[in-house]
């Protein structure tokens, strides 16, 4: 940036920096020092930086947070050993052995396969609803 043609000026409460190009000849007469002082003294807005809260500490500490933590979690899930399906069913084998359909099959195979939706509740509901129509 050409310090003679442009200088930076502080404007507003939020400390935003504005570049102005007018009054070039007047500043040349004053000299470059005033313009350079303006540039050095101006407060720039706080731009968030990635790991600024860690200071100039080690790289290992930066890796404990943010993206690296998320990436480690994904890698651990991917590398986790897949358990066999038989191992996960072992606690249930006793209950599965006792499970039978004998009581349901006594009624008849057709009724056991397709239980009726009407168990008497529909009649009660229709009797309640018809007077309201």
Curated annotation (Swiss-Prot):
<keyword id="KW-0509">mRNA transport</keyword>
<feature type="region of interest" description="Disordered">
    <location>
        <begin position="22"/>
        <end position="66"/>
    </location>
</feature>
<protein>
    <recommendedName>
        <fullName>Protein Rev</fullName>
    </recommendedName>
</protein>
<dbReference type="GO" id="GO:0003723">
    <property type="term" value="F:RNA binding"/>
</dbReference>
<feature type="short sequence motif" description="Nuclear export signal">
    <location>
        <begin position="89"/>
        <end position="102"/>
    </location>
</feature>
<feature type="short sequence motif" description="Nuclear localization signal and RNA-binding (RRE)">
    <location>
        <begin position="59"/>
        <end position="82"/>
    </location>
</feature>
<keyword id="KW-0813">Transport</keyword>
<dbReference type="GO" id="GO:0044196">
    <property type="term" value="C:host cell nucleolus"/>
</dbReference>
<comment type="function">
    <text>Escorts unspliced or incompletely spliced viral pre-mRNAs (late transcripts) out of the nucleus of infected cells. These pre-mRNAs carry a recognition sequence called Rev responsive element (RRE) located in the env gene, that is not present in fully spliced viral mRNAs (early transcripts). This function is essential since most viral proteins are translated from unspliced or partially spliced pre-mRNAs which cannot exit the nucleus by the pathway used by fully processed cellular mRNAs.</text>
</comment>
<keyword id="KW-0694">RNA-binding</keyword>
<feature type="region of interest" description="Disordered">
    <location>
        <begin position="104"/>
        <end position="133"/>
    </location>
</feature>
<feature type="compositionally biased region" description="Polar residues">
    <location>
        <begin position="34"/>
        <end position="43"/>
    </location>
</feature>
<feature type="region of interest" description="RNA-binding (RRE)">
    <location>
        <begin position="13"/>
        <end position="27"/>
    </location>
</feature>
<comment type="subunit">
    <text>Homomultimer; when bound to the RRE. Multimeric assembly is essential for activity.</text>
</comment>
<keyword id="KW-1048">Host nucleus</keyword>
<feature type="compositionally biased region" description="Basic residues">
    <location>
        <begin position="51"/>
        <end position="66"/>
    </location>
</feature>
<dbReference type="GO" id="GO:0030430">
    <property type="term" value="C:host cell cytoplasm"/>
</dbReference>
<feature type="compositionally biased region" description="Basic and acidic residues">
    <location>
        <begin position="22"/>
        <end position="31"/>
    </location>
</feature>
<keyword id="KW-1035">Host cytoplasm</keyword>
<dbReference type="GO" id="GO:0051028">
    <property type="term" value="P:mRNA transport"/>
</dbReference>
């Amino acid at each position: 940036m050409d310090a003679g043609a442009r200088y930076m000026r502080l404007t507003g409460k939020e400390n935003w920096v504005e570049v102005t190009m007018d009054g070039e000849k007047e500043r040349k007469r004053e000299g470059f020092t005033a313009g350079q002082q303006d540039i050095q003294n101006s407060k720039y807005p706080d731009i968030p930086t990635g790991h600024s809260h860690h200071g100039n500490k080690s790289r290992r500490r930066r890796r404990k947070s943010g993206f690296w933590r998320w990436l480690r979690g994904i890698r651990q899930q991917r590398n986790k050993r897949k358990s066999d399906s038989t191992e996960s069913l072992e606690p249930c084998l006793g209950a599965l052995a006792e499970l039978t359909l004998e009581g349901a099959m006594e009624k008849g195979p057709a009724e056991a396969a397709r239980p009726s939706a009407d168990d008497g509740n529909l009649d009660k509901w229709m009797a309640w609803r018809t007077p309201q129509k």
